[in-house]
A protein has these predicted regions:
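A short, contiguous, amphipathic alpha-helix enriched in charged residues
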Residues: 2-10, 84-85, 129, 133
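Glycine-rich, flexible beta-strand/loop modules in the N-terminal catalytic cores of phosphate-handling
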Residues: 21, 26-103
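Short, Gly/Pro- and small/polar-rich lid/capping loops
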Residues: 1-25, 29-32
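Conserved beta-strand segments that form the floor/walls of ligand-binding pockets within enzyme
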Residues: 61, 109-113
Length: 133
């Protein structure tokens, strides 16, 4: 059975990955899966949250947002339950594969911004974040 966009049920969306998309960010990726596009940056700061101070481990945190023009109807700026859930999921997913002990007292800040939403934004953001880190 074909989907609305013409793909077969087992066919993936075309994927493109453009690393180094933002010159001022040590890790940046423009990730596209079909018409969905997510821009992710990863940057370091020499600090950790208070609960980790003095423990010799680092941290990874994530933020996720959908730009107002990313959906057919204008998406309001600001936090909402879905965005909060997704940014926590991104953080947890990456902390599961990043050796925070090797970071020392540093934090990796991941920012994921959906610039065009056409389905699969959560998985696109997680994948792009992994590439950016």
């Amino acid at each position: 059975m074909a989907r609305v966009d013409g793909r077969e049920s087992g066919e993936l969306r075309p994927i493109t990955i453009e690393r180094g998309f933002i010159a001022n960010s040590p890790g940046s990726v423009l990730f596209r899966a079909g018409a969905t596009a997510v821009l992710v940056t990863a940057q370091l700061s020499e600090s950790v949250p208070p609960f980790l101070e003095g423990k010799g481990v680092g941290w990874l945190t994530a933020e996720y947002a959908m730009l107002p023009g990313s959906t057919p109807g204008r998406k309001r700026r600001g936090p909402d339950g879905r965005a909060t859930e997704i940014q926590r999921l991104i953080g947890r997913s990456l902390r599961a594969v990043v050796d925070t002990r090797a970071l020392g007292p540093w934090t990796i800040h991941v920012d994921a911004d959906v610039i065009n939403a056409d389905g699969g934004t959560r998985t696109a953001a997680i994948t792009a974040a992994f590439i950016a880190v």
